[in-house]
A protein has these predicted regions:
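A short, sequence-level motif marking secondary-structure junctions
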Residues: 23-30, 71-78, 210-214
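C-terminal partner/receptor-binding element of secreted or periplasmic proteins
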Residues: 85-122, 228-231
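Short solvent-exposed beta->alpha transition segments
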Residues: 145-187, 195, 200-203
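Short conserved beta-strand and strand-loop elements enriched in small hydrophobics
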Residues: 8-13, 56-65
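Exposed beta-sheet edge and beta->alpha loop/turn motif
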Residues: 1-2, 74, 182-233
Length: 233
């Protein structure tokens, strides 16, 4: 409703401050958008480091006198109608937006929406243990070690979350099995596919994440031992 179909608006990338113009083409539970011109496409690709990516990024939508916290991915897919050098469209998510195939909001997009709104720390602290694990795994797949660190207990010596960005290109969560909270502890099990930089192989893993409730902080944090599980080939 804020961005009617075929409306144009400006987006600002939170990390770089770079802006570009876009048009909403379709979408109902989230917006399918396209860069407006070839120059806008070039600006978007610059924001993504010169390569298209499914990674989510925090953005602010500037529409009239409104500033709306949002999240994008940077991968052209599907149909595109504008002559802009962008082969398809990409997705723009807001608070509680969902994808075409799932009824629940996308965890990675929601992390970035709240980052854009200046509520990242609060949002992570308010998540239940299952949703926190999903958010941490998604951010690990993006190599966003700064956000991963916000969701985990201090890693032991020899475990460096920074290795995620250096080694892992992507993590695909194929399915998950939720656990039960017992004595301030929650364990979730995930079947994931891990892809490493410079390696075309798919590494299928079954990993376990354990969250512990930190009474002094009033929130959940994930134990960091899952990092070693992800990084083992």
């Amino acid at each position: 409703q804020l961005l009617p179909r075929y409306s144009t608006f400006t987006l600002m990338d939170l990390e770089t401050g770079l802006t570009w113009n876009a048009q909403r083409r379709a979408g109902s539970f989230h917006a399918d958008i396209q860069p407006l011109t070839n120059q806008d496409t070039l600006q978007l690709k610059t924001i993504y480091g010169g390569s298209w990516s499914w990674n989510r990024r925090a953005v602010v939508v500037l529409a009239g006198n409104r500033r709306i916290a949002a999240s994008i991915n940077g991968m052209p897919h599907g149909a595109g109608a504008l002559k802009n050098g962008f082969p398809g469209h990409h997705c723009l998510h807001f608070w509680e937006s969902t994808t075409h195939t799932k009824s629940r909001p996308d965890p990675a997009h929601q992390v970035m929406v709240h980052k854009a709104a200046g509520r990242l720390h609060t949002y992570l602290a308010e998540l239940d243990p299952n949703d926190l694990q999903l958010a941490v795994l998604e951010m690990a797949g993006q190599g966003d070690t700064a956000i991963v660190r916000l969701g985990i207990l201090n890693p032991p010596d020899g475990t460096n979350p920074g290795q995620l960005a250096a080694q892992i290109q992507n993590i695909n969560i194929r399915d998950s099995q939720q656990g039960e909270v017992e004595d301030g502890r929650y364990t979730g099990r995930y079947n994931v596919s891990v892809y490493f930089h410079g390696d075309n192989s798919e590494y299928r893993k079954s990993i376990t994440l354990t969250s512990r409730y930190q009474a002094d902080l009033g929130r959940w944090l994930v134990e960091p031992d899952f990092l070693a599980q992800l990084l083992t080939r």
